[in-house]
Structure formats: structure tokens, C-alpha cells
Regions:
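Conserved alpha-helical "signature site"
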Residues: 1-255
């Protein structure tokens, strides 16, 4: 169905607040829960005594996730000169605990969504862009007084709102995908307004994919900087809570 949510009266109400959007999304649509494996990884990362062996064992329960982590560890991006024969070696020798945990968390989390693989906004390009932003955020983090691992996670997960849009509203997502292909220089916000924001301000997605992602991350109880970086990364000139993480993601997006 169409995603416009109409309020009572003559259609002249002001645009929905973010709290109203969150409330309507949760009442009207079945928002995907965080997948069980992603939740287990998130809990492990919150444990300061967790070991590389525990992380490797958790990942190795999932053959597909294991293969993807091994592929990243062997990729030219990290340029490790030796052999990598196990997930534990990927953790201890190449990628480090935080990076493996965060990549695994991202990979496990995207399984919550059914989104096309292809197209400029498809899953393949989504991952390429997310990993690139995460890598840049990790480099930028020390210069911003931010924590590197958390910066990486902010970069990796900042665009999850796009996946939720694609999952809940496939027809509109296809239209947005085509618009993006035809207008690569346009801002995502302006393209989203063309697809979602044409009525009287009552369209729940007119707040943009960033805010939608922030709502999902808050529901999934991800760390506050991750929620904020996703939620406001489309707002230029943002000043407020976790500003350094937001600016980092915005800079990585622009590079």
C-alpha cells in the first residue's frame, strides 16, 4: 500500500515529529527485530572480558559469516602478507577484535532486510559504501576525540535506514533507486523528498532515511553515538549530542 499517513482534519497539519514517526512506524508496520546472531555479537562486544576465541567461535557457528570475514581478512584492503587460515587468526593477526565484531554485527544485522542486491542503492553497493565509510571513520576518529571502534560502527551502520525503506516499501525503493541512478550528483534528501515528501507533510518517510535508521537503531538498543550518527547524518550543520561522531560520518560520506 501507499505509505502516506494522513492525520485528521483538512490535511494542513504540520509535518510529523520524529517521535510521531517512530510511533506510527512501530504501530503500522512490522519492524524487523535484530537477528539473533547479531544480538549475540552485540552482547559479546559489550563484555570487556570477551576473548578473540569467543568471538571466533560465535562467528564460526555461521558458515556464510565465516566465509565473509575470511574474505575481508585476505583482501587487498588490509594487505596482510601472511596466510590467514581461521577466523581466530583473522581476529588476532589482521583485523583486530573490534573490527571483526563490528563487521560481523553489520553482516548479521542486514539479514533482517529483504532488499535487492543490484542497483546503485542495492545491497552490494550498500556494503561497499558502508565498509568504505567505516574504514574512513576509524582513521578520522582519533582526530575528532572519538573512539575508533565506535567510529567504525557508526560508519558501518549509518545507512541502515535505506535498508528499512527498501524492506518495508519496495515499490518506492525501486523508484528511489532509479532516481539515484539518473541523478548521481543530487542529494539523497532531495531525491527522497521527490519520492516520499510530495503531500502535506504527513508522509512518515519524508523525514529521510537517516532518521528512519536512527529509529531502528534505537529500537535495537545500539550505542547512543550509532543511533545519533545514523539519525542526523543527513542534517548539515548539526550541533548537539555526539556531534563528533555525526561529523565523522558526514565527512566520510562526502569523501
Amino acid at each position: 500500500g501507499h505509505l502516506v499517513i494522513r492525520g485528521p482534519g483538512n490535511g494542513n497539519r504540520e509535518a510529523l515529529t520524529l517521535e510521531e514517526v517512530a510511533d506510527k512506524l512501530q504501530k503500522l508496520y512490522r519492524l524487523p527485530p535484530m537477528p539473533a546472531l547479531a544480538l549475540r555479537i552485540l552482547r559479546l562486544t559489550a563484555n570487556t572480558d570477551a576473548t578473540a576465541r569467543e568471538l571466533a567461535e560465535l562467528i564460526e557457528f555461521d558458515p556464510s559469516l565465516t566465509a565473509q570475514i575470511m574474505r575481508y581478512a585476505r583482501s587487498a584492503l588490509f594487505n596482510y602478507p601472511g596466510q590467514v587460515n581461521s577466523v581466530q587468526e583473522a581476529v588476532t593477526r589482521v583485523l583486530g577484535f573490534d573490527r571483526v565484531a563490528h563487521i560481523a554485527l553489520g553482516i548479521a544485522s542486514v539479514r533482517a532486510f529483504e532488499v535487492p542486491r543490484h542497483g546503485i542503492l542495492g545491497m552490494d553497493n550498500f556494503w561497499r559504501h558502508s565498509l568504505y565509510c567505516a574504514f574512513l571513520c576509524q582513521i578520522i576518529a582519533p582526530r575528532c576525540g572519538a573512539e575508533k571502534g565506535l567510529g567504525y560502527l557508526c560508519g558501518l551502520l549509518h545507512n541502515f535506514g535505506l535498508l528499512l525503506v527498501g524492506h518495508l516499501f519496495p515499490a518506492e525503493f525501486d523508484e528511489l533507486n532509479e532516481l539515484r541512478e539518473a541523478n548521481p550528483e543530487a542529494s539523497m534528501h532531495s531525491l527522497e523528498q521527490q519520492v516520499f515528501g510530495q503531500g502535506n507533510g504527513q508522509e512518515i518517510l519524508s523525514v529521510g532515511h537517516g532518521a528512519i535508521g536512527g529509529i531502528l537503531h534505537r529500537l535495537w538498543q545500539l550505542p547512543d553515538p550509532v543511533v545519533k550518527a545514523a539519525g542526523v547524518h543527513q542534517q548539515s550543520g548539526y550541533h548537539g549530542e555526539h556531534e563528533n561522531y555525526v561529523l565523522m560520518v558526514q565527512l566520510a560520506n562526502a569523501l
